[in-house]
């Protein structure tokens, strides 16, 4: 069961956006925000673990909101890649956030169309 079955697509997107904001700001903390970037970490394992930990928190939010472990796993991978791109200087903060929200919109579409069962 997910929010879609109770309130519709807009409420589902809104819930995804709230979960994203919580995981990207208060739940991330200064340490993960810095250490998930390769240039800030003192050893390779530090940035990989930090980026993965942050992406797992994001994945948990998607799983909780959608009820789909598959979408949660998808978020883990996509969030990891998007934040890697930002950390490597491929794009900035605004593009990073727009890409994350585009993923959430894609999850809503997939759920509305019934492509992923929950």
Where are the model-predicted features located?
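A metal-dependent hydrolase signature that marks the N-terminal structural subdomain at the beginning
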Residues: 1-7, 11
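Transmembrane helix interruption/hinge and helix-loop junction motifs
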Residues: 7, 61-71
